[in-house]
Amino acid sequence: MSVSKKPMVLVILDGYGYREEQQDNAIFSAKTPVMDALWANRPHTLIDASGLEVGLPDRQMGNSEVGHVNLGAGRIVYQDLTRLDVEIKDRAFFANPVLTGAVDKAKNAGKAVHIMGLLSAGGVHSHEDHIMAMVELAAERGAEKIYLHAFLDGRDTPPRSAESSLKKFEEKFAALGKGRVASIIGRYYAMDRDNRWDRVEKAYDLLTLAQGEFQADTAVAGLQAAYARDENDEFVKATVIRAEGQPDAAMEDGDALIFMNFRADRAREITRAFVNADFDGFARKKVVNVDFVMLTEYAADIKTAVAYPPASLVNTFGEWMAKNDKTQLRISETEKYAHVTFFFNGGVEESFKGEDRILINSPKVATYDLQPEMSSAELTEKLVAAIKSGKYDTIICNYPNGDMVGHTGVMEAAVKAVEALDHCVEEVAKAVESVGGQLLITADHGNAEQMRDPATGQAHTAHTNLPVPLIYVGDKNVKAVEGGKLSDIAPTMLSLMGMEIPQEMTGKPLFIVE
């Protein structure tokens, strides 16, 4: 008979943030004797679950996908926007071999460097600061012919806000003494995602042939003419920017073309028009053999260079457990099952060796305020049985209630959800202690602690950027460390289990055994 295992259990109370203010705070308003006692008597700390600490832009609220990726990875996992911001700030961007290689090859052959992308401060599909950095990279490396093809936004930015951005780039080119804005067109044409190829064709012709419906001497003049035609940024018609005596910027074989959008969905169609030999969306008037670089991978089947391929996460918590022949269980309701499996495993769909999974069906109700306890009783029953089974070295569980009921904006329901969770935590903590295991209780982001927006007085249904609790229950004498974040959880668990922490995990243990 094998020895019974004493599991390391991680319970993630989804959407269970920490907020001092009591007003409109479902967690404070709920009767939670169990969590109150644990917070009062057990080692605990507060950890960051939003913004830069989880790889999101500064002060941006956390979310479940990002939260679980960070929890399982044991390192900050940067989202594309933040990853690029960081790369540009520390100048790694300017040494990116794919970008520098494309620019150098074009420059050495006397060819042009074309840069295209959504000129926007919206940060949803792209960011104009990244495009500016690309212009600087091309100029620094000695490219003489630098052409910017600006797709205008007006959806993730105000409808008529492109002028200041275009001015900034025209001033930049003037200061460099080389390069120019060569075309402008609304994202409605250049960034279609619904196979409306007639739109994409207009953008393709503008770029490849330097032909459009309109022409202007400067980008700002072209934009003002569009406004006079009653076209907002998003719908600006294909406009060639070319002053008297300037050469045209039509693309030629051997030119470099760098696409500076980082979000894939609206970048794919125009990319395929340039890259796919068998492209049939429309009859291309000019097929041009450019050195095409995607900033990120827009689709696995688009075969061209990628400056920032998807980061594959090596030695996540789940993978490290498997490599060390440990058994693990992932358990949640339908609503958060993908989070404790796929996202916690760093985007890996298949389970690791020794990894079991239990899915509890979430209740079939229109909205969860109608059943705020959700399926927590059944989930707890299965979790307690797994803890007592002696089968698992570690168990990861997510209770969705705080988040799913928090999203409804119904305060009374959120209070009931939190009270249901308190009973569950009591059962789980008792089970863990009865087998000599260890338990960490935390959250992936906040939600239920802020049920009304103080600015508008309306229901607050979104996540928050507040910290989340972390509590230790177990027989080890530990001291909490301040200033933690979600990516410290995996190293904390490994440390409490007496295991080595892989070097890829840059997070730090938050409970030190004394």
From Swiss-Prot:
Main enzyme class: isomerase
CDD domains per UniProt: iPGM
The entry's keywords: Glycolysis, Isomerase, Manganese, Metal-binding
Residue numbers annotated as active site: S64 (phosphoserine intermediate)
GO biological process: glucose catabolic process; glycolytic process
Residue positions binding Mn(2+) 1: D403, H407, H463
Record's keyword annotation contains Nucleotide-binding: no
Cofactor: Mn(2+)
Reactions mediated catalytically: (2R)-2-phosphoglycerate = (2R)-3-phosphoglycerate
Co-factor remark: Binds 2 manganese ions per subunit.
The EC number(s) this enzyme carries: 5.4.2.12
A Pfam family: Metalloenzyme
Residues engaged in binding substrate: H125, R155, D156, R187, R193, R263, A264, D265, R266, K336
Pathway listed: Carbohydrate degradation; glycolysis; pyruvate from D-glyceraldehyde 3-phosphate: step 3/5
Isomerase among keywords: yes
Superkingdom of origin organism: Bacteria
Residue positions binding Mn(2+) 2: D14, S64, D444, H445
Gene Ontology cellular component terms for the protein in this record: cytosol
One MF annotation (Gene Ontology) recorded for this entry: manganese ion binding
Assembly information from the UniProt record: Monomer.
Biological function: Catalyzes the interconversion of 2-phosphoglycerate and 3-phosphoglycerate.
Similarity section: Belongs to the BPG-independent phosphoglycerate mutase family.
Name of this chain's protein: 2,3-bisphosphoglycerate-independent phosphoglycerate mutase
Annotated organism of origin: Escherichia coli O1:K1 / APEC
Gene that produces this protein: gpmI
